[in-house]
């Protein structure tokens, strides 16, 4: 399955705390924060200044809110702000939606990157103050737009990483083939590389539907 990390990684026997210019940074990897009583519980005993978690968390509809709620719980558990970093892009049948963010100890959302695109953000976190300044918070897409953009990104990266030069579509005139054509166009295929073939059987819609 997607989360069968034992195929690639050997588990460590203790949690990691890094010292960066005097700041104690606890490090967690993806599934670590989803397990109650796991590595985060150990980090809660380490008096850390920041919890950093690196994720390859694939897109699911509604998962953005689930991640945020989980991060708020973990930040409160370790009594420190939390930075949630997430991969972005398509990998075979998976789409990673990005949307990295920062939450404060009290659950305030301090920074959020856009979804479905690479982004380089800088955020100043002062662990010596009680209330942090809020940075740039990217708006969440409309639910329908979110699903559509995930499909387009998955198609775009799959085609690019397999070195496909174009697409050939069977266009019946129905909504489904029209939507696929729109996705191909939004994925960046120029008109000369996107060929549409109108089906000549008895099922296609009349030409005046176009």
Set out the residue ranges of the language-model regions.
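Enzyme catalytic cores with a strong preference for nitrogen-chemistry domains
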Residues: 1-170, 176-195, 200, 205
